[in-house]
């Protein structure tokens, strides 16, 4: 008997998942997509399997704007295990070396200013970055170490929350592309004892914070009781990840031409940059960029059904 193909639903919006430990970001996405029975889905940048916390999952029209969430600043809390270095820079790897820990809170806090502001980081070998088309983590698993170029990242805030024995709990606000494993390893090296990430929790991704997330267990429980449609109440609006952007509302006439791909004028527009756009009914219709001539050029449009 031929297997009946599951007919997926058109679902538009963002679910803010509190990713559980042990899941890859893609595994978490596919699980939630299955629960929602959604046609189209994508996530906004990977969290390590070890990590938990804020993982925005985009569905339908929201996938068109996932890149902008990928580019957003992030916030983390991490536990640095002092005195132990590992192959991966976190608790998933094999122990490379153990050293005595002779430093305390004053020594750690004295070093933190070195990591604040714009700094250079060398990405870890165990990362999804590619070298000649091959992910670095695959090369690392094969025992290879390749040269990696240092990259500029910005640490807006770095605080020591607690020091319990040989574990330092840190809070970090940072730009995209920041590797917390590298930050912890570099701190451990300066302390002279080495360190690795024992725990990692993402607390913020762009405008989204941990308090707004839902767990996989909560989604599964609601699905078991009410099916896929019952999960729609957890969906955030398609443009919720762009809420910090300037908002323009077009007239019916301007919206019509803009949705045909034509730049239009908006007297209240900023002088430059990206904007999100609503039609005369307050419906989000896409994002645009202010051109040199002051007109708003469409960059990503959503399907309005009109």
Curated annotation (Swiss-Prot):
Gene Ontology process terms (BP): mRNA pseudouridine synthesis; tRNA pseudouridine synthesis
Catalysis: reaction(s): uridine(55) in tRNA = pseudouridine(55) in tRNA
Broad EC category: isomerase
Record's protein name: tRNA pseudouridine synthase B
Species of origin: Ectopseudomonas mendocina (strain ymp) (Pseudomonas mendocina)
Pfam family of the protein (one): TruB-C_2
GO molecular function annotations of the record: RNA binding; tRNA pseudouridine(55) synthase activity
Active site: 48 (nucleophile)
Family: Belongs to the pseudouridine synthase TruB family. Type 1 subfamily.
InterPro entries hit by this protein: PsdUridine_synth_cat_dom_sf, PsdUridine_synth_N, PUA-like_sf, PUA_sf, tRNA_psdUridine_synth_TruB, tRNA_sdUridine_synth_fam1_C, TruB_C
Keywords tagged on the record: Isomerase, tRNA processing
Function comment: Responsible for synthesis of pseudouridine from uracil-55 in the psi GC loop of transfer RNAs.
Enzyme nomenclature, EC number: 5.4.99.25
């Amino acid at each position: 008997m031929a297997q009946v193909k599951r007919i997926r639903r058109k679902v538009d919006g963002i679910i803010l998942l509190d990713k559980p430990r042990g899941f890859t970001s893609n595994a978490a996405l596919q699980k939630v997509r299955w629960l929602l029975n959604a046609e189209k889905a994508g996530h906004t940048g990977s969290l390590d399997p070890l990590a938990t916390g804020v993982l925005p999952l985009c569905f339908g029209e929201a996938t068109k704007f996932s890149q902008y969430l990928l580019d957003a600043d992030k916030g983390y809390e991490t536990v640095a295990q002092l005195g132990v270095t590992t192959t991966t820079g976190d608790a998933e790897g094999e122990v490379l070396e153990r050293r005595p820990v002779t430093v305390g809170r004053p020594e750690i806090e004295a070093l933190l200013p070195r990591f604040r502001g714009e700094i250079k980081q060398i990405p870890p070998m165990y990362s999804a970055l590619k070298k000649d088309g091959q992910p670095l983590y695959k090369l690392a698993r094969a025992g290879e170490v390749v040269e990696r170029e240092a990259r500029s990242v910005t640490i807006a805030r770095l605080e020591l929350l607690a020091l319990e024995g040989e574990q330092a709990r840190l809070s970090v606000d940072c730009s995209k592309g920041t590797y917390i494993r590298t930050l912890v390893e570099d701190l451990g090296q300066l302390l002279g004892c080495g360190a690795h990430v024992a725990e990692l929790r993402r607390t913020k991704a762009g405008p989204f914070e941990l308090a707004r997330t839902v767990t996989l267990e909560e989604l599964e429980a609601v699905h078991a009781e009410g099916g896929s449609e019952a999960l729609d109440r957890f969906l955030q609006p398609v443009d919720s990840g762009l809420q910090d952007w300037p908002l323009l509302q077009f007239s019916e006439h301007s919206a019509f031409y803009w949705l045909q791909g034509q730049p239009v004028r908006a007297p209240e527009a900023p002088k430059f940059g990206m904007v999100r756009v609503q039609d005369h009914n307050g419906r989000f219709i896409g994002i645009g960029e202010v051109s040199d001539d002051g007109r708003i050029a469409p960059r990503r449009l959503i399907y309005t059904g009109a």
